[in-house]
């Protein structure tokens, strides 16, 4: 039998052979097989930054600046002046102070992840982010972000934790008839698809609040009463210039 050669076209965006519109072909013979393969996109290089902190917070609230990445080649550093915060895993624990635990009351601890699109030279306070309004219940704050600040502050995630005191000091045995004490509470939350664009001063190698021009991420903790808190946060980010 005479030698025959089969000519078929191949599209790089598909694994199946289709018509001959692309101009690219695969020559199939009994002795050779030549393919024009589709190139694979290289995955993004994700860096990991872990930040841990603990302190005391009053009923005025506190704000912690999260993405203070310095410039460098390490996994906990930013690669350039633009970084993309992809996701975050946060572990937050709060506990009543001894004075609050000795009262028979229920308290609420509000928390939020907020991005500041116009950060200044110094760290903002809770009163700069939230405005308060009269509350129908004692020991409960009603707060909101003012309309003129909506373009500056955006809430990424938020929630609250409840704590209860039963009139006994922390560590005391419960007396009969006393309400249950809940002097400690915690959250373990993975926040994905954040995609926050963090822009730093190109002339600065530090990541402090004065060096970031856009995309400062804050952890806001606002309790009804003085508490102790501690958190560990793992942030996943990549180079925004790549």
From Swiss-Prot:
A motif (Bipartite nuclear localization signal) lies at residues 1-42. Keywords: Capsid protein, DNA-binding, Host nucleus, T=1 icosahedral capsid protein, Viral penetration into host nucleus, Virion, Virus entry into host cell. InterPro entries: GV_A/BR1_coat, Viral_coat. Gene3D superfamilies: 2.60.120.20. Transmembrane segments: none annotated. It is found in: Virion; Host nucleus. GO terms for cellular component: host cell; host cell nucleus; T=1 icosahedral viral capsid. It comes from the Viruses. It holds the Pfam family Gemini_coat. GO terms for biological process: symbiont entry into host cell; viral penetration into host nucleus. GO terms for molecular function: DNA binding; structural molecule activity. Encapsidates the viral genome into characteristic twinned ('geminate') particles. Binds the genomic viral ssDNA and shuttles it into and out of the cell nucleus. Plays a role in protection of the genome from degradation, virus acquisition and transmission by insect vectors, infectivity, and systemic movement. The CP of monopartite geminiviruses is absolutely essential for virus movement. Homomultimer. Binds to single-stranded and double-stranded viral DNA. Interacts (via nuclear localization signal) with host importin alpha-1a. Belongs to the geminiviridae capsid protein family. This is Capsid protein.
